[in-house]
Amino acid sequence: MARLRIPSNFIGTLGSDTLVGEELNASPAIGIDILIGGYVLTLSGKDTLTGISTGNDGGSGTGIANRGKLNTGNGSDAIAAIGDGGNGSKGGNGGSGTGIANSGQLNTGNGSDAIGAIGDGGKGSDIGNGGKGGNGGNGTGIANNGELNTGEGNDAIAGSGDGGNGGYGGDTNSDKYIPLLGKGGNGGTGIGIANNGELDTGGGNDAIAGTGNGGTAPKGGFEGYGGAGIGIQNVKGATITTWTGKDTITGNGNSSRANSTTYGIFNDGVIDTGKGSDKVIGQAIATDAYNNDGLVYGIYGQGIIKTDDGNDQIIATGILDGVQQQVSIGGGINIDLGTGDDYFKGFGVASVDGGYGFDTLDLTAFNRSQLLVSGVISGNTLNCATFTFNSNGNPISFSITGFEKFIFADSSFSYSTLANRA
């Protein structure tokens, strides 16, 4: 099956339309390619679009590339895409793999729609006789640089990105017999959802999930670095908006080997979940890190997260070689939980406002005695309080306002009792 290239433009029927594009062993390989000025309009109905691609010899693979307009109309529509980067040829790096690359307008209309995309980076080549292995390619599930709108309805967006593994440098058994022979290639970066535009799910009980798995660096010789894993990345100036409904945003980042860097949600833009009882969950896991040199943050960045009205939950966790980290947030991010009985779990360099309602702060990663508390004034929960943790001589401060209950590993306090013991 060949690449489906638009134009020629496509207008569907009022029934259930199906479009499939597949391109294998090409460089670059693109399953469905909508060019600037091109459009796909499938009108109403339960429509299905599928794009599959595999690059060759280190070439890139993109399941669906949209630089024009893709509109599936009203109805419960499904868009699926797989983009595999090609493995590196001798001496080369693996190619990048992207499930959906949108720099135009992608609109699924009203209805309970589903978008799923997988991007796998290619493996770096193996080099013998003391050479350097190729680096793994980057993998991105959904890369949105334009407008992505799923309209009204209970919509689901899922992106999974796997970085390619680095190639061996020298003999594959060099870690056993010749420890300093060759240098392994680095693993590629894996990002589930990378948003540099507008991602809007409209009203409804929506779910956005991103999983990013960094590629590994092979052992043997001088070991390369493991690739970063980022579940959801929302850059400066970009927005993720889920509007009214019980929405869930989940970012899972995974990485392994030396210099592991992992983020569940990396937000430098704005994430707004709108009204409703919403959940935002960021989890970062690093394994087999050299001398525990991994960097893991459940939620990180310099942006803003707003959950508006409703009984909302935000949870940030980081796990390094099986050990839950006490510091799971970073970058100085600002979080506003709005009105409602909210729950927040996590600690790090951030400012968190519980807003109005009976809000709970979960600090069960710490005993009460491990944190220095300042700024607490009895009867005034709106006064900014600061929790400070001494991390190997490095003080880490966490600023909060508007919380009424505080849970530690060994105790729990109301605001007034915490103030009395601050």
Predicted segments, located by residue:
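Acidic, glycine-rich low-complexity repeat segments characteristic
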Residues: M1, G95, G137, N186-G197, ...
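Glycine-centered beta-turn/loop sites at beta-strand termini
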Residues: G12, G21, T42, T72, ...
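N-terminal segments that cap or nucleate solenoid repeat domains
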Residues: M1-T62, R67-G68, T72-D77, T242
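Extracellular beta-strand repeat scaffolds in secreted/surface proteins
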Residues: L49-G51, D77-A81, I115-A117, I157-G159, ...
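Conserved consensus positions within extracellular tandem repeat modules
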Residues: G15, L24, L43-G45, G73-G75, ...
